[in-house]
Each structure stands twice: as structure tokens, then as C-alpha cells.
Amino acid sequence: NSKSQMDKDYYQLQAVLEAERRDRGHDSEKIGDLQARITSLQEEVKHLKHNLERVEGERKEAQDMLNHSEKEKNNLEIDLNYKLKSLQQRLEQEVNEHKVTKARLTDKHQSIEEAKSVAMCEMEKKLKEERDAREKAENRVVQIEKQCSMLDVDLKQSQQKLEHLIENKDRMEDEVKNLTLQLEQESNKRLLLQNELKTQAFEADNLKGLEKQMKQEINTLLEAKRLLEFELAQLTKQYRGNEGQMRELQDQLEAEQYFSTLYKTQVKELKEEIEEKNRENLKKIQELQSEKETLATQLDLAETKAESEQLARGLLEEQYFELTQESKKAASRNRQEITDKDHTLSRLEETNSMLTKDIELLRKENEELTDKMRKAEEEYKLKKEEEINILKAAFEKNINTERTLKTQAVNKLAEIMNRKDFKIDRKKANTQDLRKKKKKK
């Protein structure tokens, strides 16, 4: 029974070792696949990083162009609206002033009409120039809007590329997580193999205990054999003593037969007693012989059992030695595989940390680019506001200059007209004096 159990344990250990070899080959193949997959993922990450940098640069350029175009558009609209309002105000002011001047100078000389026509021509010329400038600005606005629409399309394409890159990054993170899960599963398998090795070591210890127990049983059987041999020797000695007594009795009986027949009755009685004793002794001898035979058979069985146990023990020792060697080899291989897997796991963890650092750097670079764009937009707004304020101040200065020049021109025109009126009045006075002198004559 113990031998069959040992054979069963031996076959189970062989099956476990074979399964462990298969798992080791499968694990090595899986590690090779994982390493190839990691290298391909690293190449893909480098390619995606390069594409992300290129798309980020294109997006930045497109965003800068779009912001610049929008700012130019807004500035042109503001300038055009401001110029249009100022021109309308100037036109209204000129019309009002013209009406006032026309009302005041209806009776004035033709020079006023000429000055008015000249002023109107100048105003019409200025209005025409303003209209041309407005049309040019509107055409420029249309072109800028077209450029803005094209830049919007480019920006949408860049955003789509960026979203695609983000999806690829998420997919790669999922793949890294799956690889981490696979590594955890490999670690669990490694722990299971270690537990199985511990179980095998425990079974080997149990086999050692069984071997000790069998040795104790063999020693007990040898002690019982020695005791039985001692009892058999004692019984043989007793049988020999009984045989000697029987011979002595027979000798006495023959001597008494020779000496006297009177003692026949006694001899018969003694003979009967002797026969009874002989029968008892024979019975005892037969019993002792049967016990001797049973003891001999038991001894033979014990010897055969001891020999078979010794052979089984030798086989078990050989199997145990082989299993121990195989277990040591498997343990060393398993340790080597565990160290290889640990190295692979550390490399994968380093790769994962490097990928995470690269993604974090890309994210930081994106945030820095966004901050730089925001700061550039704010600086551009401030610069544009300063330019607008400068242009506004220059325009107001030009308007004030034009107003002063216009006021000076009107004053000069009024002065000229007053001089002409004075000359006309003087001529009238002279003509009246001449008429009076002629009448007096």
C-alpha cells in the first residue's frame, strides 16, 4: 500500500514537473512576445511623439495666424467704423457749417461761391478717397475672413489629429495596463509554483517520516524474530531433556523387567503414565513444532517483507534522490525564471514609467504652449490697444488741426469778404461824392 502510494506520488511529481516545464516554455514564449510588443510600442510612442510635436507646431502656427487675422480684422473694423463715424460727423459738421455759411453769404460775392465749390470738391474728393479706402478695407476684411475660414479648417484638422493622437495615447496606456495585468498573473503563477514546490518538499518530508517508521517496524520485527528464536531454542532444549528422561525411563523399565515381573502392574502403570506423558510431550512437541513452523513462516514472511521493504526503500531512496535532484533543478530553473521575470518586470515598469514621464512632459509642454499663447495674446492685445490709442490720438490731433485750419480759412475768408465789402462801400461813397460834385457844378 505504501509502495503504491509512493508510486502514485512519484507519478504526480513527474506530472507536476512536466506541467512546470510546459508552463516555463509557455512563459518564456509569452515573455518574448511581451518584449517584442514593448519594443513595438516604444517605437510607436516615439513616432506618435514626433507626430504630436509636429501637429502641435502646426496648431500653434495656425492658432497664431488665426489670432493675428482676427486681431487685424477687429482692428480694421474698429478703424473703419471709427473713420466712418468721424467722416460722417465731419460731413455733417461741414454740411451744417456750409448751410450756415451759405445763409450768411447768400448776398456775397462770387468768390464765396468759388470757395464753396472748391471746398465741396475737396470734400467730395476726400469722401471719394474715404470710400475707396473703405472698399479696400472691406476687400481686405473679406480676404481676412477667407483666410480665417481656411485657418479654421486647418485648426479643425489639427484638432482632429490631436484627438487621434490622444486616442492612440489612451490605447497605449490601456495596453500598458494589460501588460501590467499579465505580469501580475505571471507573478501569481510564480507564487503557485513556489507553493507547489513547498508542497513537494512537504511530501518529501512525509516520505522521510514513512521511511523512519518502516525502519522502526523492521527493527520491531527483527526483535520479535530474535525472541521467537530464543523461545524455539528453549523448547528444543526442553524436548531434548524430555527425550533423555524417556530413555532413562525405558532403561529403568527394561531393568525392572529383567529383575522382576512383580512390578508389571507398576510398570504398566508407569508405562501408561509414561505413555500419557509421552503423548502429552508429543502433543506439546507437535504444538511446539507447529508453533515453530508458524514462527518460521512468520519469520520468512517478515524476512521477505523486510527484503521487499528494503528493495522498496532502495527504490524510494533512488526515486527520492532523483525527485530531489529534479526538484532542485526545477527550483534553480524556477529561481532563474523568477529572476528573469523580475528583470523583465523591472524593465517593463521602467518602460511604463518612461512612457508616463514622456506623456507628462508632452502634457506640460502643451500647457506651457497654451500659457505662452495666452500671454502672447494678452501682449498682442495690449500692444494693439496702445497702437489704437496712438492712432486715435494722432487722428484726433489731425482732426483738431483740420478744424483749426478750417476755422482759420473761414476767418480769412470772412476777412477777405469784409475787405471786399469795405472796398465796395468805399466805391459807392466815392461815386456818391462824384455825383454830388457833378450836381453842384
From Swiss-Prot:
It holds the Pfam family Rho_Binding. Its cofactor is Mg(2+). It is an enzyme of class 2 (transferase). One of its GO terms (molecular function) is small GTPase binding. It comes from Bos taurus (Bovine). It is found in: Cytoplasm; Golgi apparatus membrane; Cytoplasm, Cytoskeleton, Microtubule organizing center, Centrosome, Centriole; Cell projection, Bleb. This is Rho-associated protein kinase 1. Activated by RHOA binding. InterPro entries: Rho-assoc_Ser/Thr_Kinase (IPR050839), ROCK_Rho-bd_dom (IPR015008). Protein kinase which is a key regulator of the actin cytoskeleton and cell polarity. Involved in regulation of smooth muscle contraction, actin cytoskeleton organization, stress fiber and focal adhesion formation, neurite retraction, cell adhesion and motility via phosphorylation of DAPK3, GFAP, LIMK1, LIMK2, MYL9/MLC2, TPPP, PFN1 and PPP1R12A. Phosphorylates FHOD1 and acts synergistically with it to promote SRC-dependent non-apoptotic plasma membrane blebbing. Phosphorylates JIP3 and regulates the recruitment of JNK to JIP3 upon UVB-induced stress.
